[in-house]
């Protein structure tokens, strides 16, 4: 029975690491897997047609640039995941450049993929702060996020990493 519970947990997490992400810059396969590293990961899921997504991205980019200079004893990484076609993402990023990597979701069911990240509704924008190697910390933020919300969630995740 224990073996099946472990397998079920592994399968439940599988969509998170499936080959449905590519790096927008070079179209190579990408992953949100942080491995055993004690890192805090901020993942912002967005689309070019989503007005709140477009509005929050400049602030997210500025927050990340400042966050990279902070020293919390734990590395903070950020990625944006676009639910769009490459040409649409290119056009958007030309007008609103960001300072963090942009990935694209290429799978067939973005709603199920977002559910696997903790988004119960599939609504955008959606941000998740994760620290899988630090007690599997996860905080989900639905809707437009503020730099203050991100800082609070990252500080909580970093504290858990330092404690563990």
Walk through the language-model features, giving the residues of each.
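Short pre-active-site segment immediately N-terminal to redox-active cysteine/selenocysteine motifs
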Residues: 39-41, 46-49, 85
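The canonical Cys-X-X-Cys-His
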Residues: 43, 50-53, 127-130
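Bacterial N-terminal signal peptides that target proteins for export
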Residues: 1-8
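Structural microenvironment flanking redox-active thiols in thiol-disulfide oxidoreductases
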Residues: 55-97, 108-113
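Non-globular targeting/processing and membrane-anchoring segments
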Residues: 159-164
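Thiol/disulfide oxidoreductase modules built on the thioredoxin-like
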Residues: 96-98, 105-155
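N-terminal signal peptide c-region/cleavage motif recognized by signal peptidases
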Residues: 13-18
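A short beta-strand-turn-helix
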Residues: 19-41
């Amino acid at each position: 029975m224990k073996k099946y519970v472990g397998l079920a947990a592994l399968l439940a997490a599988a969509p998170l690491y499936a080959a449905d992400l590519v790096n927008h810059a070079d179209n190579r396969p990408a992953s949100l897997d942080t491995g055993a590293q004690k890192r805090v990961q901020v993942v912002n899921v967005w689309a070019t047609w989503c007005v709140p997504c477009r509005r929050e991205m400049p602030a997210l980019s500025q927050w990340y640039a400042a966050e990279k200079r902070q020293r919390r004893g734990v590395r903070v990484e950020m990625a944006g995941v676009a639910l769009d076609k490459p040409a649409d993402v290119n056009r958007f990023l030309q007008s609103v450049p960001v300072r963090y990597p942009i990935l694209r979701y290429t799978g067939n069911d973005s709603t199920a993929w977002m559910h696997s990240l903790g988004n119960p509704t599939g609504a955008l924008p959606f941000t998740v702060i994760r620290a899988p190697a630090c007690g599997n910390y996860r905080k989900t933020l639905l809707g437009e996020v503020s730099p203050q919300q991100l800082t609070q969630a990252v500080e909580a995740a970093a504290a858990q990493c330092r404690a563990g």
